[in-house]
Amino acid sequence: MNVEHEVNLLVEEIHRLGSKNADGKLSVKFGVLFQDDRCANLFEALVGTLKAAKRRKIVTYAGELLLQGVHDDVDIVLLQD
C-alpha cells in the first residue's frame, strides 16, 4: 500500500470515529484510533501513517511520537479533507 492511499484511509477513519472540537474541526483521540478493530486491520503502522499525514499538514497533534497507553488522550485533529 502506498503512503497517499494510507493517509486517505486515515482521513476516512477520522471522519468515522471523530467529532467536532471547539474550533469546529474534526478530531479523535489517539487511543480511539489505535484500539479500533477496523483501524488495526487497515494500518500496518498507524503511527507511521499519522507522521506522514502530519508532514503533509493533513492532521496535527501534540508531540512527534505517539505511544499506545502513554498518549491515548492526545487529540488527532484533521486540518484538511
From Swiss-Prot:
Residues bearing PTM N-acetylmethionine: 1
Domain of life: Eukaryota
Keywords: Acetylation
Keyword Acetylation (UniProt): yes
Pfam families membership: Costars (PF14705)
Residues annotated as signal peptide: none
UniProt cross-references to InterPro entries, sorted A to Z: Costars, Costars_dom, Costars_sf
Keyword Acetylation carried by entry: yes
Record family assignment: Belongs to the costars family.
The protein's name in its UniProt record: Costars family protein ABRACL
Organism: Mus musculus (Mouse)
Gene designation per UniProt: Abracl
